[in-house]
C-alpha cells in the first residue's frame, strides 16, 4: 500500500546512525489518535487548573487550598503539547518523551482526584453554617448542642448571598476538579499505551529489517529469532513503502583529444587540429582522395613543394588494391579495377595508369595513423628519373599483380606507349644518406647480345632486396650528362626496382618481364615477408649476400656484393614498428637475408652466365640503393608465421617453385 502525499509530508528521512531521530511511518488513524490524545490532555489540564484556582479562591481554609490539584493541571497541559508535537514530528524520541509524561500525568491526576473528592465530600457534609462577619463558618452536624468543633476544622466560605449557596458552589467546584483529574488519568493512560505500542513496533521492525545485526552478535545466528509481524503491526506500519533509488549520473561518451594518432591523421589529411576535437572510434574518416582531391597535378607531395611539376598530366584510371589488417600487418587481399569516378577506401592502394604505369599513389592509412613520423605521400609523374623512356613501343599493361601495388600482369608487347617510373615518395631524406635501390639479376646469353624480349622459361628473372644497393659492373659508365637532383623511389610494397644490363638496356623490358612472372606466382609464406615490405630511409643498409637461384632443377652460385658504408647514427622512426621498440624483428630479417646456403662466386659472374646490371644511367657516383622495409609490425601473427617459414628456408627446407612456360623458378627473399 503506497502512502499518501500527506503522510510522506509528515515524515522525515530516517538516519540509521541516530536511533532517537528515527521517525515512524504511521498511518493516518494512528497519527490522528496521537493528535486527539494530545489535545485532550491540554484541554483537561487547562480545566483542572481553572477549577482548582477558583476553588482555592472561594474558601479560606488552608487545607482545602492546598488540596486543590492545580499542579496536576499544569503537567497535563505540558504532556498534551508534547503529544501534539509527536503528531507533527513522529520521532522516536518525542514519542518516548510523550509516553513518559503521560505516565507521570496519570499519577498526578490520581492524586489530585483523591484530594479534590475528599474536599468535595467535606463541603457536602458541613451543613451547619453561621455568619461570622463576612465569612460563613460551617460545621458538621453534631447531635450535641455545642458550637463547632475545634478551631481549624470548620469550613469557611466567602459570603455570597447566603452561606448555603457559597458552600454549594465550593462543593461543585471540588467535585468538578475530581472528575477532571479522573478523566485526565484515563487519557494519560491511553496516551502512554499508544506510545509504548509504537516504540515496540519500531523495535520489531528493526529486528525484521536488519537480521544481520543479530548474526554479528556474540551468540551468532541463534541470538535473535524474529517471527513475522502481526496483522495489527502490518496495518499500523507501512512496510511496503517504495523508496525510489538514486538516479545514475548522466552518461557522456568518451572524448578522445589530440594524441599521436590524431596528429598523424591530421598530417595525412593535410589538416590542422588547433583545438581538441572529439574523435569517436566508430566514426570512419573520409577517403584520402575525397579529402585531398587527387586530380592531375594535385597528386604531388603534401610537404615537399619541390616535387610539384606543372608538366605532370595523369589521367585517372584507378585500380584499387584492398588491404586487410592481419594483427597489425598489411596483407594485400584482392585487386580490382574501378571506373574513373570511383574513390578507394582509406586502406586501398591507388594506381594511376594511362597506357603505361604513370603514377602510383598508395595510402597506408593504418601505418600513417599510428605513427608520428612526418612522412608524406607524394607522386611524381614526370618522365625524368632513373629510368629513361625507351623507343620500343608497347601495349598498355593491365593492372594486376599478386603481391605489389604497381605491377603489370603481362609483359608489354611492342607497339604500346612507353612506361614511366612509379613514384611513391614517403619522405624526402637528405641526398647524402644513400638510399638502397634493389636490383634485378638476369641471366644474359654468353654471346653478349640482348634481345628485345628475353624468353621467360630460359631466363627467369628473380627479385630480391639488396640493402646495399646495386653495384655498377666494371666497364659500364653513365653517359656524360648533368645529373638531376636525386629522386628517391620509396615504394609501397616489396616489388624491387629493375636495372638494365647495359647503358642502352631497356628497363621496362625487364620490369614487365618480372611482373609477368610474379603475376603467375602464388603468394606463399616464404614470399610473404617481402610482399609487405615498404620503403623507408635507414641509417645503415647492410649488404646481404645474394640468394641462390634455381632454374630447371639446377643450382647456380650467386655473386657476392661489396658492402657500402653509410653514415651511421640514430635515425628517427618512420613506421609503427620503429615506434614500438626500434623494430625488434629487423635483426631477424637482416640475419636471415645475410645467410646463404652456398658460398657465392666472388667474381660476380656465375657459371651459368649471371650478370649484374646497373640501375640507372646517372645518379650519384658509385651506387644507388633502395632499401625495402616492412610496413607491418613483425610482432603480429602473420609476420611470425613468415619468420618461421624463413627459418625453414634457413634450415634447408626449400619452397615449391612454379613453372611459367616450361621454366621453373623460385621466389627468393
Curated annotation (Swiss-Prot):
One of its GO terms (cellular component) is membrane. Keywords: Glycoprotein, Membrane, Phosphoprotein, Transmembrane, Transmembrane helix. Glycans are attached at residue 160. It comes from the Eukaryota. The modification Phosphoserine is found at residues 359, 390, 494, 575. Residues 399-408 have a biased composition (Low complexity). It holds the Pfam family CD20. Residues 387-420, 445-502, 550-571, 597-624 are annotated as: Disordered. Coiled coil: none annotated. It is found in: Membrane. It is a multi-pass membrane protein. The chain crosses the membrane at residues 34-54, 67-87, 91-111, 174-194. GO terms for molecular function: WW domain binding. May interact with WWOX. Belongs to the ENTREP family. This is Protein ENTREP3. It comes from Mus musculus. The lineage of its organism: Eukaryota, Metazoa, Chordata, Craniata, Vertebrata. The gene is Entrep3.
Amino acid at each position: 500500500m503506497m502512502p499518501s502525499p500527506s503522510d510522506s509530508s509528515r515524515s522525515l528521512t530516517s538516519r540509521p546512525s541516530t536511533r532517537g531521530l528515527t521517525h515512524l511511518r504511521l498511518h493516518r488513524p494512528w497519527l490522528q489518535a496521537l493528535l486527539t490524545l494530545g489535545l485532550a490532555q491540554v484541554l483537561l489540564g487547562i480545566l483542572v487548573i481553572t477549577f482548582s484556582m477558583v476553588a482555592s479562591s472561594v474558601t479560606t481554609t488552608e487545607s482545602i487550598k492546598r488540596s486543590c490539584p492545580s499542579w496536576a493541571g499544569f503537567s497535563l497541559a505540558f504532556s498534551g503539547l508534547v503529544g501534539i508535537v509527536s503528531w507533527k514530528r513522529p520521532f522516536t524520541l518525542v514519542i518516548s518523551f510523550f509516553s513518559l509524561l503521560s505516565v507521570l500525568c496519570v499519577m498526578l491526576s490520581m492524586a489530585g482526584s483523591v484530594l479534590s473528592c475528599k474536599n468535595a465530600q467535606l463541603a457536602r457534609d458541613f451543613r451547619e453554617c453561621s455568619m461570622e462577619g463576612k465569612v460563613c463558618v460551617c460545621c458538621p452536624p453534631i447531635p450535641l448542642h455545642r458550637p463547632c468543633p475545634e478551631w481549624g476544622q470548620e469550613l469557611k466560605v466567602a459570603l455570597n448571598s447566603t452561606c448555603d449557596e457559597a458552600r454549594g458552589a465550593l462543593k461543585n467546584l471540588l467535585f468538578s476538579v475530581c472528575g477532571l483529574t479522573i478523566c485526565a488519568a484515563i487519557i494519560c493512560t491511553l496516551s502512554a499505551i499508544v506510545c509504548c505500542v509504537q516504540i515496540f513496533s519500531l523495535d520489531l521492525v528493526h529486528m525484521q529489517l536488519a537480521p544481520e545485526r543479530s548474526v554479528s552478535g556474540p551468540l551468532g545466528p541463534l541470538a535473535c529469532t524474529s517471527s513475522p509481524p502481526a496483522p495489527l503491526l502490518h496495518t499500523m506500519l507501512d512496510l511496503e513503502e517504495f523508496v525510489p533509488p538514486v538516479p545514475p549520473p548522466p552518461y557522456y561518451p568518451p572524448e578522445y583529444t589530440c594524441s599521436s594518432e590524431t596528429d598523424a591523421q591530421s598530417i595525412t589529411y593535410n589538416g590542422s587540429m588547433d583545438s581538441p576535437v572529439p574523435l569517436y572510434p566508430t566514426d570512419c574518416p573520409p577517403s584520402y582522395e575525397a579529402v585531398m582531391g587527387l586530380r592531375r597535378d594535385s597528386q604531388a607531395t603534401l610537404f615537399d613543394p619541390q616535387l610539384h611539376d606543372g608538366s605532370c598530366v595523369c589521367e585517372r584510371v584507378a585500380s584499387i588494391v584492398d588491404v586487410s589488417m592481419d594483427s597489425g600487418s598489411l596483407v594485400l587481399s584482392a585487386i580490382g579495377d574501378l571506373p574513373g569516378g570511383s574513390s578507394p577506401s582509406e586502406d586501398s592502394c591507388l594506381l594511376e595508369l594511362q597506357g603505361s604505369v604513370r603514377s602510383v599513389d598508395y595510402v597506408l592509412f593504418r601505418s600513417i595513423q599510428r605513427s608520428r613520423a612526418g612522412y608524406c605521400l607524394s607522386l611524381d609523374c614526370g618522365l625524368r628519373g632513373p629510368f629513361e623512356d625507351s623507343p620500343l613501343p608497347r601495349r598498355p599493361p593491365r593492372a594486376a599483380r599478386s603481391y605489389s601495388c604497381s605491377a603489370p600482369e603481362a609483359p608489354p608487347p611492342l607497339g604500346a606507349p612507353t612506361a614511366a617510373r612509379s613514384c611513391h615518395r614517403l619522405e624526402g631524406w637528405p641526398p647524402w644518406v644513400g638510399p638502397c635501390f634493389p636490383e634485378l639479376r638476369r641471366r644474359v646469353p654468353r654471346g653478349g647480345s640482348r634481345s628485345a624480349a628475353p624468353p621467360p622459361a630460359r631466363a627467369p628473372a628473380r627479385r630480391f632486396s639488396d640493402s646495399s644497393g646495386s653495384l655498377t659492373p666494371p666497364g659500364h659508365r653513365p653517359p656524360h650528362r648533368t645529373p638531376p637532383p636525386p629522386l628517391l623511389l620509396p615504394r609501397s610494397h616489396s616489388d624491387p626496382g629493375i636495372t638494365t644490363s647495359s647503358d642502352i638496356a631497356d628497363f621496362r623490358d625487364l620490369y614487365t618481364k618480372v611482373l609477368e612472372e610474379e603475376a603467375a606466382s602464388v603468394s606463399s609464406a616464404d614470399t610473404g615477408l617481402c610482399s609487405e615490405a615498404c620503403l623507408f630511409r635507414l641509417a645503415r643498409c647492410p649488404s646481404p649476400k645474394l640468394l641462390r637461384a634455381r632454374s630447371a632443377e639446377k643450382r647456380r652460385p650467386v655473386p657476392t656484393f661489396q658492402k657500402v658504408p653509410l653514415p651511421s647514427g640514430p635515425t628517427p622512426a618512420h613506421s609503427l614498428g620503429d615506434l614500438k621498440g626500434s623494430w625488434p624483428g629487423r635483426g631477424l630479417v637482416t640475419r636471415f637475408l645475410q645467410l646463404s646456403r652456398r658460398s657465392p662466386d666472388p667474381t660476380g659472374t656465375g657459371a651459368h652466365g649471371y650478370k649484374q646490371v646497373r640501375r640507372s644511367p646517372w645518379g650519384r657516383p658509385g651506387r644507388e640503393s633502395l632499401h625495402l622495409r616492412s610496413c607491418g609490425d613483425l610482432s603480429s601473427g602473420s609476420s611470425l608465421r613468415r619468420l618461421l617459414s624463413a627459418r625453414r628456408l634457413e634450415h634447408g627446407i626449400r619452397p615449391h617453385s612454379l613453372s611459367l612456360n616450361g621454366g621453373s623458378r623460385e621466389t627468393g627473399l
